[in-house]
Structure formats: C-alpha cells, structure tokens
Amino acid sequence: LGKALPRARVCGFDISKLAVKAAAGKHKGIPFAVASSFAIPLGTGSVHLLTDVFSPLAQAEFARVVKPGGFFLYAVPGERHLYGLKEILYEAPYENPHRETAYEGFRFVRREQVRDEISLPDGEAAMDLFAMTPYYWKTGVEGVKRLQEAGAFQTEIAFDFLVYERL
C-alpha cells in the first residue's frame, strides 16, 4: 500500500509478535504493533482504509476506527480455497461458506475474486502450507499422516476480496 499510495500513512498490526517482528524488519519506516482486531490501537474515525486478511471480523471495532466515507477491505477464503489439501486431510472434504456481505455501519461495494492453483512438490511443502491454516489445529492424526506421506499435488487457491464503504 505504501508504494501504491506514497503520501499515505501506513501502519500495521497483528496479534502475533513473530508476524509483527517479521513485518517491521521487512518494511522499515512503517510502524507495526502487536494488537488484536478487537482492540485496534488507533483513534475513532482515523482510518481511511482498513484491511483485514484472513482474520476474525471485529465489526464494531472496524466501524469505530474507519472514518465515514472510508473503506474496509476484507480478504476471506473462497468456497474452494485449498480444496485439494482438504481432500487429503479429510474423508469428507468441505467447501468454505460463502461470506455474507451485509455488515452494520458499512455499505457493500463489491466482491473481487482471485482463483488459481498452486503446486506442492512433496509432503514437506504440504506440511509448511498446512501449518499456516486453521486446519492445523483441528485435523486428526490420520489426516496429518496422509499429508506427510503425500507426493506432489495441486490445490486450488480462492480468495474473495470484499470492499465496504463506511456509512
């Protein structure tokens, strides 16, 4: 965002200390903080554009910090995001739910979808991807074993970018 909007003041936060440390090291000059989406360390109505990438929706807090006429960009997994991975992990793989687009205090503007496939060359690469997903915390031992033993495979990636304007 800083490169696309050079006059913008950009900051970032994440609940993970490791993620904040990595981001601060990579993006010198941009302030980062360890914080929850449910307690954003910014003033009321101070944000022109808020982005939320694969994090829980903190609707009331987002409405508090985004100024009227400002925007909220919500990146969520599409219905078939990582479906090939789920076919290995689960006996009955499932699609992700289609996200609702109505949030109090915001007007839905549009949905942009990105769809593609990625190749995972072996079980090690698959395990690296798996560790970054919520499936890591809720998959049984048998599913993990199948993934560790997986050869090369492809999986879909599906991202929905939902754009909202603050009322």
Please report, for each region that a protein language model flagged, where it lies by residue.
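Short glycine-/small-residue-rich Rossmann-like dinucleotide-binding loops
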Residues: 54-55, 77
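Class I SAM-dependent methyltransferase SAM/SAH-binding core
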Residues: 1-40
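Short, charged, surface-exposed secondary-structure boundary motifs
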Residues: 21-22, 43-45, 82-88
